[in-house]
Amino acid sequence: MEESQAELGVEPPLSQETFSDLWNLLPENNLLSSELSAPVDDLLPYSEDVVTWLDECPNEAPQMPEPPAQAALAPATSWPLSSFVPSQKTYPGNYGFRLGFLHSGTAKSVTCTYSPSLNKLFCQLAKTCPVQLWVDSPPPPGTRVRAMAIYKKLEHMTEVVRRSPHHERSSDYSDGLAPPQHLIRVEGNLRAEYFDDRNTFRHSVVVPYESPEIESECTTIHYNFMCNSSCMGGMNRRPILTIITLEDSRGNLLGRSSFEVRVCACPGRDRRTEEENFRKKGQSCPEPPPGSTKRALPSSTSSSPQQKKKPLDGEYFTLQIRGRKRFEMFRELNEALELMDAQAGREPGESRAHSSHLKSKKGPSPSCHKKPMLKREGPDSD
């Protein structure tokens, strides 16, 4: 085959070239040349060294470098419980200390609203919440006002109220003064001091008491609540109370008052919903003093006014009916209605008079066995 192609002078296609021809096409400094094999041999240890090393350490395996230990996931932080639960009982003291709030409705646009029936403040995250301080007589100089949050339910009271880890790490709403873990802040007061009690671990914020301005009867402090009530890792839907105390310069108590707080997205809606539920439960009715007798509420049947009897219509109407069969049907229907009126006792005298009038007007009813005789008039009759 090759000889025949050589004789004809036709070159074979590439697929028909021999292996020797392809080998000659490779460059001289190929990967399989002996020049590149020498450095590789130098990298390998001599056989004598390997034998010596195995004889010296027969029981030791080659030690591989240990991989760096993976950073273990940090466990959930368990904050220490407080051994001190502050009192939440209202104490006006000698100065008649009490709190007040601005009147606001339940519109969706409100950012802060107070419910007097619930003694509860509804507000949005980091929004201004004005709290009024009322006193009957001015307290001594150096008096301070402290605000502290505690959990309302008994099973949570020993836990410290703090912000959620998400809000603690967030740089939003950071003023550079308040610690990131504090829930309550004071807005617009550079004299505010934030305390972390070393013994009770409670968080509080203290501001100096300022006398009311001219033509004003109360002092107003603007608070901010820096975490939602529904935040996981924080309040986690647990109700909280804010305790406002009036203290002298030595920390002695002069007055105390408290209110519940809910930090939510729509304060007006939540206030309206909780007040409706409160009224449905009947808790809005004040309890009678001890020793007083409760009056039973009248039953609904006796309290409801009696329905007035509608007088029977005394008018009479004449209805022309075509066909005796239809007439009998309407007559029976009318008698049934008259009987119902008589049994109901509505205007019995008038019903009897009305039925007698119908009988006299109708005349004797034809017998069902006798066919009434009707005179047929022909076309010639007058």
UniProtKB/Swiss-Prot annotation:
Covalent cross-link Glycyl lysine isopeptide (Lys-Gly) (interchain with G-Cter in SUMO), where: 375
Ranges of Basic residues composition bias in the record: 354-373
Gene assigned in the entry: TP53
UniProt-annotated stretches for the region Interaction with DNA: 262-269
Chain positions with N6-acetyllysine modification: 108, 294, 310, 362, 370-371
Region (Oligomerization): 314-345
Name this polypeptide is given: Cellular tumor antigen p53
Motif, Bipartite nuclear localization signal: chain positions: 294-310
Region of interest called Basic (repression of DNA-binding), as start-end residue ranges on this chain: 357-376
Cellular component per GO, a single term: mitochondrial matrix
Modified residues (Omega-N-methylarginine): 322
Residues bearing the modification N6-lactoyllysine: 108, 127
Protein localization: Cytoplasm; Nucleus; Nucleus, PML body; Endoplasmic reticulum
Modified residues (N6-methyllysine): 359, 361, 371
Region (Interaction with USP7): 348-352
Region (Interaction with E4F1): 245-283
Protein family membership: Belongs to the p53 family.
GO biological process terms held by the UniProt record: cellular senescence; circadian behavior; DNA damage response; entrainment of circadian clock by photoperiod; negative regulation of cell growth; negative regulation of DNA-templated transcription; nucleotide-excision repair; oligodendrocyte apoptotic process
Entries under PROSITE patterns matching the protein: P53
